[in-house]
Each structure stands twice: as structure tokens, then as C-alpha cells.
């Protein structure tokens, strides 16, 4: 993990265009190739980023940029598309690198952990012919909650949340990008499963080709037999 605090401007060029004017920001360069641009307020989310796989090229600025005070230019190129993140660094205030090693991943507790266990035991809840490959399928960027096969034998990656929001869809998207590079698993499609899924998350999931499934936690635990209820 490389952390750089710098005065910089940022441009995203590709399927969409975005510009961040000159300001002091935190640049995170991760071992998986992703680059994230953070500010000190507004949101815990990055202002802009490039997802892996991507390559970072550092170059000297052109004369016109030198005149504007640019000392170094970063070009982060997506390996899959023509999208680029261009970071013009005017001044580095701090820079440090750390080897964080292999992360064991998020250890879930409470309802999410129970949902994972229950769905793994009742994988047919997702459809006829579904079978479990394994829970906590490890990847270089973290564990996939459940990896399964559908009735046609295709691989399915399942992300579980108690309350599903956009961040969960983004997380599953990253897993799918990585898993689909494995010829032994591809093609891999995604299912975003939760007790409640926010409308914005459903829209984003649909745009990404990810199915959304609402889980009845009580019914899965055998507490609430929905078929026997009068109301």
C-alpha cells in the first residue's frame, strides 16, 4: 500500500469525464493495481478511482503543464477499457509505502454470518438445481460470501448483506471482474442477496447485470412459516 498526500488535480477520461481542480488530497495505490483519490471530507468514499486491473505510469509533465506548476504526472490506465485516471501532482507533502501482506478478510458476525450459513445450507432457495461450491471463496481482493453453480452448471458469485446498498453492489462487481478472469470459473454471474435492498442498489445491480434476491431471514431460520400464515 502506497500513500501519497499531494497537491494535485485529477481528470477521469473515458466512458465518462470528470475533473477535480487543484487541492490537497490523499492518493492510495494498492497492490492489486487500484488507485483511489480521497479528500478530508464529504464522504468516506473516494472522490475518484480506477479499479483493477490497471497500470500506473509516472511521467514528467509536458512544457505547458510545467508552466502551470505540475511536477509529476500519473496516468492510471484500465486494462479492460480506454478509461484513464490522470493525476497532475504539483507538490508531494508526504509519501509512505507499507507491505500489508495477505488480508484474512472480513469476519462477519450476527445476522450476516447467519444468513451466509443458512443460504449455504439452503442454496436451493435461489432456484432449482443450485449447488454449493463453497462458502468464503478466497480471492486476491477478499472472500466471496458464497460461490455456487446454478441449474445450468454456470458459476454464480453471491454477496450477502443484511441491508443491501450501492457499496455492496460495487464490492460484488469487483469480485466478478476478478473471477471472470479465471478460465476454470468463467463465465461468472452475480447475485446480490439481502434482507432489504435499497432502490438505488437495485438500479445499479440491474445495470451491471447482477440479480437481486430478497431473503426472508425468519423463514430461513424456520421461525416464520410464511406459507402457513393467514395474513
From Swiss-Prot:
HAMAP family per UniProt: NucS
Role played: Cleaves both 3' and 5' ssDNA extremities of branched DNA structures.
Gene name of the record: nucS
InterPro entries listed in its UniProt record: Endonuclease_NucS, NucS_C, NucS_N, NucS_N_sf, tRNA_endonuc-like_dom_sf
Gene3D superfamilies (alphabetical): 2.70.180.20, 3.40.1350.10
Pfam families, sorted: NucS_C, NucS_N
Protein name, per record: Endonuclease NucS
Organism of provenance: Pseudarthrobacter chlorophenolicus (strain ATCC 700700 / DSM 12829 / CIP 107037 / JCM 12360 / KCTC 9906 / NCIMB 13794 / A6)
Enzyme Commission number(s) from the entry: 3.1.-.-
Keywords: Cytoplasm, DNA-binding, Endonuclease, Hydrolase, Nuclease
The keyword Transferase is annotated on this UniProt entry: no
Amino acid at each position: 500500500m502506497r500513500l501519497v498526500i499531494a497537491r494535485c488535480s485529477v481528470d477521469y477520461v473515458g466512458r465518462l469525464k470528470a475533473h477535480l481542480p487543484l487541492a490537497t488530497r490523499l492518493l492510495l495505490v494498492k497492490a492489486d493495481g487500484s488507485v483511489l483519490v480521497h479528500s478530508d471530507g464529504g464522504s468516506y468514499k473516494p472522490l475518484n478511482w480506477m479499479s483493477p486491473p490497471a497500470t500506473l505510469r509516472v511521467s514528467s509533465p509536458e512544457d505547458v503543464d510545467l508552466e502551470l506548476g505540475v511536477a509529476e504526472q500519473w496516468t492510471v490506465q484500465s486494462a479492460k477499457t480506454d478509461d484513464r485516471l490522470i493525476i497532475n501532482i504539483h507538490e508531494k507533502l508526504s509519501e509512505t509505502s507499507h507491505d500489508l501482506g495477505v488480508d484474512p478478510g472480513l469476519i462477519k458476525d450476527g445476522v450476516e454470518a447467519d444468513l451466509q450459513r443458512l443460504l449455504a445450507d439452503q442454496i436451493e432457495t435461489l432456484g432449482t438445481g443450485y449447488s454449493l461450491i463453497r462458502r468464503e471463496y478466497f480471492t486476491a481482493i477478499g472472500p466471496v460470501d458464497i460461490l455456487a453453480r446454478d441449474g445450468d452448471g454456470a458459476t454464480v458469485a453471491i454477496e450477502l448483506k443484511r441491508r443491501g446498498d450501492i457499496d455492496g453492489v460495487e464490492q460484488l462487481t469487483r469480485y466478478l471482474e476478478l473471477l471472470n478472469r479465471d478460465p476454470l470459473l468463467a463465465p461468472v454471474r452475480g447475485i446480490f442477496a439481502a434482507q432489504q435492498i435499497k432502490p438505488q442498489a437495485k438500479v445499479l445491480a440491474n445495470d451491471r447485470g447482477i440479480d437481486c434476491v430478497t431473503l426472508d431471514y425468519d423463514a430461513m431460520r424456520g421461525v416464520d412459516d410464511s406459507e402457513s400464515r393467514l395474513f
